[in-house]
C-alpha cells in the first residue's frame, strides 16, 4: 500500500516511527513533512496528505500532531477525505468498518509509539462493511457536496 504521511512539529517523532513501521511492513510511504521538531503550522501538511489520497497517489493517509484534533479537522477540509482521530484500536477499526475513513489522525503527545503503531495496523487492515453504512456515507457526501458549492 502507498500511505501518505504528514505531521507538524508535535507529531514529527511519531511520524518517523510510523514511517519506519510502514516501510518495515512493505508499504510505500509518501512523506509530506515536516522534517524536524521546529515549530510549524499543521494545516498545509494535512491538506497535502488529503490531496494525495483524493488524487489516488496514496491509498490512505496518516496525519500526526500534538493531539491529532486539528490535524483531523484540517484534513477533513479536503473534499472526499474522511479523517478519523483514533486513540485506540477499537475506534480505528470502526473508523474503517463503519465510516470508510481514508485518513487516520494520531496525537503524538497522547499516544506512546507502541500504541500508535497498533492503531495504524488495525486501521490499515480493517475494511469497510458497507450495508447500512453505505447509506450513511452517501448522506455525508451529499452534505459535503452541498456545502462545497
Question: What does each of the following model-derived ranges do?
Answer:
Residues 13-14, 40, 70, 114:
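Residues that form or flank phosphate/diphosphate-binding pockets in enzymes
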Residues 4-24:
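Glycine-rich phosphate/diphosphate-binding loop of Rossmann-like nucleotide-binding domains
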Residues 20, 47, 51, 73, ...:
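Alpha-helical segments flanking ligand/cofactor-binding loops in enzyme cores
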Residues 28-39:
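A short beta-strand-loop structural module common to alpha/beta enzyme folds
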Residues 45-85:
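Helix-adjacent hinge/juxtasegments
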Residues 20-29, 80:
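Short helix-loop-beta junction
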Residues 2-6, 10, 89-149:
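C-terminal binding/interaction regions
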